[in-house]
Amino acid sequence: MTVRYQIEQLGDSAMMIRFGEEINEQVNGIVHAAAAYIEEQPFPGFIECIPAFTSLTVFYDMYEVYKHLPQGISSPFESVKRDVEERLAEIAEDYEVNRRIVEIPVCYGGEFGPDLEEVAKINQLSPEEVIDIHTNGEYVVYMLGFAPGFPFLGGMSKRIAAPRKSSPRPSIPAGSVGIAGLQTGVYPISTPGGWQLIGKTPLALFRPQENPPTLLRAGDIVKFVRISEKDYHAYKEESN
């Protein structure tokens, strides 16, 4: 496929590849395809790729790259740029990213989702309809950010979209599932935030003692599964 992009230098050990400005699943899919292909076909000095909504940052060891400079190229950036452009040109039309499917149990409403009724009212739906729509979707992890392991998820139905709270909460419990605009996400740690809270998961999305420390990674497919309050507490007891 023809991949359109722009490459910018970031300091002396990184570059950013921009694939557009519009946030959608097609562009984000290209970001993850590029990241996966570069990781499968690393160039000398490659360290890692960090995908975002519409861009990919590639980190490299400039000293290692310098050791392998091709004839006629004088800088590590130009060498990496050439290597990256070659790989982007090689991405096949049918190249597919190996995506994991991760199910996240959620207890909706009540003390776990204090804004569920507000989201329902905004969209002229019942709370049950909001839950049904939310659990029937498949969500792509566009990127991790804001807080350690916080997944920005694409693919949510417009039918349950809701604006951020006018006044952010000073502290949102870890595991809270929220909606902001056309996105849904899960708070991995306790932090201030302004998303509309519709439920809570007993799973720990950020586990600093483990490797990797995050449950999710960019490119994953997330499915939310409704559970009862009893099941929620059972999950918590098992994890403790």
Curated annotation (Swiss-Prot):
Keywords: ATP-binding, Hydrolase, Nucleotide-binding, Protein kinase inhibitor, Sporulation
KW Signal (keyword) present: no
Entry's Gene Ontology molecular function annotations: 5-oxoprolinase (ATP-hydrolyzing) activity; ATP binding; protein kinase inhibitor activity
Binding residues annotated for ATP, in chain numbering: G194, W195, Q196, L197, I198, G199, K200, T201
E.C. designation(s): 3.5.2.9
Superkingdom of this protein's organism: Bacteria
Catalytic activity: 5-oxo-L-proline + ATP + 2 H2O = L-glutamate + ADP + phosphate + H(+)
GO biological process assignments: sporulation resulting in formation of a cellular spore
InterPro entries for this protein: CT_C_D, Cyclophilin-like_dom_sf, PxpB
Induction annotation: Induced by glucose when readily available sources of nitrogen, such as ammonia or glutamine, are scarce. Transcriptionally activated by TnrA and repressed by KipR.
Deletion phenotype: Deletion of the gene enhances sporulation. Deletion mutant grows less well than wild type on minimal medium with ammonium as nitrogen source and cannot grow on 5-oxoproline. Mutant lacks 5-oxoprolinase activity and accumulates 5-oxo-L-proline.
SUPFAM superfamilies: Cyclophilin-like (SSF50891), PH0987 N-terminal domain-like (SSF160467)
Subunit-level organization: Forms a complex composed of PxpA, PxpB and PxpC. Interacts with PxpC (KipA). Interaction with PxpC prevents the inhibitory action of PxpB (KipI). Interacts with KinA. Two PxpB monomers bind via their C-domains at a conserved proline in the KinA dimerization and histidine-phosphotransfer (DHp) domain.
Family: Belongs to the PxpB family.
Role played: Catalyzes the cleavage of 5-oxoproline to form L-glutamate coupled to the hydrolysis of ATP to ADP and inorganic phosphate. In addition, is a potent inhibitor of the autophosphorylation reaction of kinase A (kinA) and its reverse reaction, but does not inhibit phosphate transfer to the Spo0F response regulator once kinase A is phosphorylated. Is an inhibitor of the catalytic domain of kinase A affecting the ATP/ADP reactions and not the phosphotransferase functions of this domain. The inhibition is non-competitive with respect to ATP.
Identification of the protein by name: 5-oxoprolinase subunit B
Organism listed in the record: Bacillus subtilis (strain 168)
Gene of this entry: pxpB
